[in-house]
Amino acid sequence: MSTKLQDHFDKITKILSGFGVEGCISYGEITFSIRDQRDIHLILKKLKKEYLFEQLTDVTAVDYLTYGQSDWQVGKVVSQTGFSRGRQQDFKTAAVDNRFEIIYQLLSMANNVRIRVKCKLKDAQIILVDSVSDLWSSANWAEREVYDMFGIYFNNHPDLRRVLTDYGFVGHPLRKDFPQTGYVEMRYDENLGRVVYEPVEIDDRVNTPRVIRN
């Protein structure tokens, strides 16, 4: 680990000492985890002002709904029963606390350092965080993409609309409970002279099963 990276980490940790934040250096990268999602805007504003993180390079999210679950059973049980077969799992789509994590990538050109700031959204009933588009204009479209793909809402966003999917699209494609086939398919209807949307007829199945070996 470089002493310069450690120096940046120590200085930023001191700046954030008054908040519920945990930091670490792993694989040559600095990461800070915010405990309370209500502090996201205030913490990022402080980082921009006091450590000159003038660029927000990305905002993204992770859905941990199926984290640690395997499509095939492996291990000692396999020798007795054989492999289980890949099949579409029925996930519980009810609200799950800590299911989503939002991630911000920041760059300080003045200090020549990048950091990652992330936060688990603990309240599954309210998947809402404050927008940081007032701090960085680049957050505008990035937050729209996170909303479109994951269904995470951003409070005080100036124009929170879908940005990647079509008008009237149902669901959020990067959620783990979103079917790989989607919900509808489209085709051109010669009689109507336009594109029509119909319920998808493809069976949703697992072609490449996820296997977790302990």
UniProtKB/Swiss-Prot annotation:
Q: Where in the cell is it found?
A: Cell inner membrane
Against InterPro entries, the record matches this protein to:
NADH_DH_suC, NADH_quin_OxRdtase_su_C/D-like, NADH_UbQ_OxRdtase_30kDa_su, NADH_UbQ_OxRdtase_CS
- Membrane disposition: Peripheral membrane protein
Listed under catalytic activity are: a quinone + NADH + 5 H(+)(in) = a quinol + NAD(+) + 4 H(+)(out)
Q: Annotated Gene Ontology MF terms? A: NADH dehydrogenase (ubiquinone) activity; NADH:ubiquinone reductase (non-electrogenic) activity; quinone binding
Q: What GO cellular component entries does it have? A: plasma membrane
Stated EC number for the protein is 7.1.1.-
**Major localisation:** membrane
Q: Which keywords does UniProt give here?
A: Cell inner membrane, Cell membrane, Membrane, NAD, Quinone, Translocase, Transport, Ubiquinone
Highest taxon of source: Bacteria
Q: Which PANTHER family match?
A: NADH DEHYDROGENASE [UBIQUINONE] IRON-SULFUR PROTEIN 3, MITOCHONDRIAL (PTHR10884:SF14), NADH DEHYDROGENASE UBIQUINONE IRON-SULFUR PROTEIN 3 (PTHR10884)
Q: What does this protein do?
A: NDH-1 shuttles electrons from NADH, via FMN and iron-sulfur (Fe-S) centers, to quinones in the respiratory chain. The immediate electron acceptor for the enzyme in this species is believed to be ubiquinone. Couples the redox reaction to proton translocation (for every two electrons transferred, four hydrogen ions are translocated across the cytoplasmic membrane), and thus conserves the redox energy in a proton gradient.
Q: How does it assemble?
A: NDH-1 is composed of 14 different subunits. Subunits NuoB, C, D, E, F, and G constitute the peripheral sector of the complex.
By sequence similarity, the record places it as follows: Belongs to the complex I 30 kDa subunit family.
Record-given protein name: NADH-quinone oxidoreductase subunit C
